[in-house]
A protein has these predicted regions:
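Short terminal alpha-helical segments
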Residues: 1-40, 103
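Residue-level detector of alpha-helical secondary structure
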Residues: 9-13, 17-20, 24, 44, ...
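Charged, low-complexity interaction regions
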Residues: 25-38, 55-61, 80-86
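Short, charged, amphipathic alpha-helical segments
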Residues: 33-45, 62-69, 90
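Amphipathic alpha-helical binding modules
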Residues: 66-106
Length: 106
């Protein structure tokens, strides 16, 4: 019997919610306008789109992969500006892996 490493949808959705919440809290505390605008304009909206797509299970693998990769690339740019944001990059990388596992086990 082959065991599928499928990530539970509710855990994935909770991780997205926690990540967005932590990004928003960090934004309020840090007051770094350029970084906050990158998160607010590029990363957070895509994370919510990903969450909605996973929640209703209405997505194409390529679309979801493209969105999470774009989030990762933007967060990498943020880390280049300020390495203090490296934990968010790591969390989005883990989220990316979990999403890829989730969609491959669909």
């Amino acid at each position: 019997m082959k065991k599928n490493p499928k990530i539970l949808t509710k855990d994935l959705l909770a991780e997205i919610d926690n990540l967005v919440e932590d990004i928003q809290i960090k934004g309020v505390l840090s007051q770094k306008q350029k970084i906050n605008s990158i998160f607010a304009e590029n990363v957070i909206p895509l994370l919510f789109e990903i969450k909605t797509s996973v929640e209703i299970e209405n997505f194409s693998q390529n679309d979801l992969r493209e969105k999470i990769n774009f989030c990762l690339a933007n967060t990498s740019d943020i880390v280049d500006i300020d390495s203090e944001y490296a934990p968010f990059y790591s969390r989005i990388r883990v989220l990316r892996e979990n999403i890829l596992l989730r969609i491959s086990g669909r």
